[in-house]
Curated annotation (Swiss-Prot):
It holds the Pfam family Ribosomal_S13. The lineage of its organism: Archaea, Methanobacteriati, Methanobacteriota, Methanomada group, Methanobacteria. This is Small ribosomal subunit protein uS13. It comes from the Archaea. It comes from Methanobrevibacter smithii (strain ATCC 35061 / DSM 861 / OCM 144 / PS). InterPro entries: Rbsml_uS13_C, Ribosomal_uS13, Ribosomal_uS13-like_H2TH, Ribosomal_uS13_archaeal, Ribosomal_uS13_CS. Transmembrane segments: none annotated. One of its GO terms (molecular function) is structural constituent of ribosome.
């Protein structure tokens, strides 16, 4: 059984440590949390506590297929990280660099439309209504410095 062990497993453009459990290893992929990794293990009938270095190549391909199209495998929409996409209106799940680019595009769209959230992002201030009297003083916001 030692011959089948892989120290690095490549899943969706990400090298994952083979010594970790399947559940933990899947959470190393950006865009995959613990609930999605648990659901993926249950969908594929994999032991979530087994080391990912021992799983077969076919199972790795199935994991990648679930990450590409989770709705095909009846993953609920509330587990997806991009529900009702702004441009397409579809429910999709993004991982790794696709997630980064989409979030950056969303921020740029908010800044371009000069929405409240966009202006707060531009100024480097908190966006979600936190108080700023005593906190966020060391952030890199643009302002006047006293000498």
């Amino acid at each position: 059984m030692e011959d089948d062990f892989k120290h690095l497993v490549r899943i969706s453009r990400k090298d994952v440590d083979g010594n970790k459990t399947i559940e933990q290893a899947l959470t190393e992929i950006k865009g995959v949390g613990i609930s999605l990794s648990t659901t993926m293990c249950r969908t594929l009938d994999l032991d979530s506590e087994a080391q990912i270095g021992y799983i077969a190549d076919e199972d790795v391909l199935k994991i990648e297929e679930i990450l590409e199209n989770p709705q095909k495998f009846n993953i609920p929409n509330w587990m997806l990280n991009r529900r009702e996409d702004y441009e397409t209106g579809e429910n999709i799940h993004l991982i790794e660099s696709d997630l980064d680019m989409t979030l950056r595009d969303d921020l740029n769209r908010m800044k371009k439309t000069r929405s409240y959230k966009g202006r707060r992002h531009e100024a480097g201030l908190p966006v979600r209504g936190q108080r700023t009297k005593s906190t966020f003083r060391n952030s890199s916001s643009v302002g006047v410095k006293r000498s």
